[in-house]
Amino acid sequence: MNLPVNRHKLAFTAGIRLQSLLGLDTKYKMQGKIYPDLRLDLQWSLPVSNGWDVSFSGGLGWISRMPTTAQLYPDFKYVDLIQLNYYHTNPDYRRINMMTYKWDNTNYQLEPARNMKWEVRADVSYKGNRLSITYFRERMNNAFDDITYYRSLAYKLYDPASIDGSALTAPPELSQLTYTNEYNLDVYSTQGNVMKVCKEGVEFQFASKRIESLKTRVTMYGAWIKTIYNSDSPQYKASSILLDNKQLKYVGLYNGDNGTESQAFNTNFMFDTYIQRLGLTFSTS
């Protein structure tokens, strides 16, 4: 929608996109839901004066970042616990026995990561030279990251010392062996909406008028971006301490990441030269 005001011009644009994942099982929280993404843009163009063309614009929008296939349908979790590993000089008398656990590692509460972004931009053109600067901010309160959980898995630990190897005529029978009841305590992970991401930055671009003597235009563009990752989801961690060659059977619960900050700045230069006689344009950057 364009609205002229004297010699000024206002332009307003609005749009909406609807997203949904089809074919999900009813166990998924996303099943049957529609996620709307709204976008609003406003531009104010000033009157052209003495070769100066100036405009200001701003935008606000939301976007839903859908989980990937690997996040929606992770592999089943398998854990093998060795109960007996008996070695005999006669290969026919050797035996290994394991307890295997299998479970579904899917997080059915997973939802799209919702990103909100706003930006303001200034564009200035003068006699074939153009400069644009954009400042933006983004925020996601439910970005994807690992969530941890622990499980205690019971198994029998058979004592190889209770086997009389000289009397064997076949692999040892488990029912005739002594054992102790043990359990394995460990930490596992799956995907969840537990990460908060805040991002802000400045993007810029300058394109010069083509220098007639060199038939060359200079373009410079780049950005500065700061990103902060924060997760208040507690994290489980298994003990790495061994006592009598056995893992210390404790699990610790720790606070989530209080904030990790990263910053990046990059600038690029590009020179494109037009050779009219050959009808060719060469670009270097």
Where does each model-flagged region fall?
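Extracytoplasmic loops and strand-loop junctions of Gram-negative outer membrane beta-barrel proteins
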Residues: 1, 21-26, 41, 85-87, ...
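Surface-exposed extracellular loop regions of Gram-negative outer-membrane beta-barrel proteins
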Residues: 1-46, 115
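Residues on the lipid-exposed face of transmembrane beta-strands in outer-membrane beta-barrel proteins
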Residues: 1-5, 40-44, 60, 110, ...
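Outer-membrane beta-barrel strand-turn architecture
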Residues: 2-9, 44-50, 64, 114, ...
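Gram-negative outer-membrane beta-barrel transporters
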Residues: 6-12, 158, 162-285
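Transmembrane beta-barrel strands of outer-membrane/channel proteins
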Residues: 14-20, 42, 56-62, 71-73, ...
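Outer-membrane beta-barrel translocator domains and adjoining extracellular loop/strand segments
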Residues: 24-31, 69-75, 82, 144-150, ...
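Outer-membrane beta-barrel signature, preferentially recognizing the C-terminal barrel domain
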Residues: 64-140, 161-170, 183-209, 260-263
